[in-house]
């Protein structure tokens, strides 16, 4: 199983909320991604991987977005199961069960979109994981999606469990995962809830990142 501990005293740049926004909201996703990239360049950390936020319809309704959005996960915020993950007492510390993929090869930009079959063929390992979500925005989870994108997809940290070999394509929708804190179930997930299956969410993320890089 996966486990983590959240303790206080983390540096402000990694978790402290802004008291005010730096300006008007980005007018569109493209500008929000550009702001996300600028923040990524200034933080001085190493980009390790990407998350795909709001893949569930329930989450999309809660955050008033019509689809998922990517966010960076830094090497400094990527942990193995059992690690101590530092947070501030003011952080939301929202924990969500996730499925993570490591890739055996890159998916370069091309004219036609990558198919689900092609994306799965590039997967090396599949991991149960826990994402710690923490908006740094003054309004928290009550802002426009462009600010969520700019705020690194609201990611604070990702905790990875042991990896397994890729599954059969039809099995990803059946994956179950849950988060318990101090023995109490906090949240549970089913693969089919993530855009119809975690393999579809993975393909969506790949397409988003390729489009953003164009």
Locations of the language-model features?
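A conserved acidic, glycine/proline-rich C-terminal tail/linker
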Residues: 198-214
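Catalytic-core "active-site belt" of small-molecule-metabolizing enzymes
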Residues: 3-200
């Amino acid at each position: 199983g996966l486990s983590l501990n959240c303790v206080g005293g983390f540096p402000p740049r990694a978790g402290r909320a802004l008291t005010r926004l730096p300006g008007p909201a980005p007018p569109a996703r493209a500008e929000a991604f550009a702001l996300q990239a600028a923040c990524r360049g200034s933080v001085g950390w190493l980009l390790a991987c990407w998350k795909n936020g709001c893949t569930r319809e329930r989450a999309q309704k809660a955050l008033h977005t019509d689809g998922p959005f990517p966010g960076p996960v830094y090497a400094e915020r990527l942990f193995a199961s059992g690690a101590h993950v530092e947070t501030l007492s003011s952080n939301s510390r929202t924990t969500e069960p996730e499925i993570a993929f490591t890739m055996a090869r890159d998916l370069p930009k091309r004219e036609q979109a990558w198919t689900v079959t092609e994306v799965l063929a590039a997967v090396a390992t599949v991991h149960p994981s826990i994402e710690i979500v923490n908006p740094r925005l003054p309004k928290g989870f009550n802002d426009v999606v462009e600010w969520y994108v700019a705020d690194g997809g609201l990611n604070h940290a990702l905790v990875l469990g042991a990896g397994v070999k890729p599954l059969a394509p039809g099995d990803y929708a059946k994956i179950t995962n849950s988060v318990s804190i101090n023995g109490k179930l906090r949240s549970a997930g089913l693969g089919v809830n993530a855009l119809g299956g975690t393999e579809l969410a993975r393909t969506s993320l790949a397409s988003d990142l390729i489009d953003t890089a164009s």
